[in-house]
Amino acid sequence: EITVRTGFEAVFRKIYSVPMPEYVSYDTDTIEKAEAFEFIDPRDDRRFYSAGDNQIAGVGDGFSRNTPAWLDTVKSYYPDFPVYGSICEANEYMTRIIGIEKALHWIGQFPERYGRFVERANEFALELTKAQIKAAGGLLDGFVVWGDMAYSNNVFYSPDYWRKYYKPGLKKIIDVCHEHGLPVIYHSCGNVNKVYEDFIDMGVDAHNPIEAKADLDVVDLRHQYGHQIGFCGNMNVMDWAACDYDELKKIVLTKLNAAKGGGFIFQSDHSVPNSIPPEKYDYVVKLVKEYGQYPLKLGTHDLDNL
């Protein structure tokens, strides 16, 4: 394992056998410290042109230190692969600066003071988005915004609070991406049903990962919202591990109904665990490649009402 102190004055531990790191301490532990918190210059060229710790892309089976410069990585993939920029929005920054428990407490204890901190975080994210697009020099195909604003049953906090303090800044980020011709995929695990219409209102081009374990179903969402928004994900990783091959084929072909007319990228609904045998992983990928061609031929799994 490894312990890392981040630029957000927090410490996380990465156990190599566990997919995600665990935050163990935060220096910003009072609302007064949050109000005094200073974000590092989002336009600092070192973010894009210098090697160093990448505390998002560096996380994998281990934790990579001193990763290549961001722009070098972009150039190594472009144009052979679609290359998306990425940015955390305020909710994800709260996880990294104060932790989700403090965030939820402060919404109740200090709603306006905490709300101003959220707004400052999104102002930082907006400027970092602009700087990233400029540094890429036209080499990006789109943008992913990391939010993670929900759990299995609902969003973490009142949708009205989110609309007041989080949504305006998020929309500004989306607008800047669109001004540069970059479609936006918004990432939030959990059940975000209560704000799906807000996603559409903000101009989110697609939602990821449509967590099946949070009672989201891509076919139902396509019924409800049509092609106002795209979808990425929804293959339940628990089913992927537990179901037999016939069951997997039924699941995959049924979900591919959401691809009618475009707008669906088939993906896992969360991080792929090591409980999925490589043979099953490969089987699902081959199914998508075979049956995900247009015109779709889904046989007995074709749904007439889509």
Give the residues covered by each predicted segment.
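N-terminal accessory beta-strand-rich subdomains and adjacent acidic, glycine-rich linkers
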Residues: E1-D29
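Active-site loop segments of alpha/beta catalytic cores
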Residues: R5, V18, T28-L306
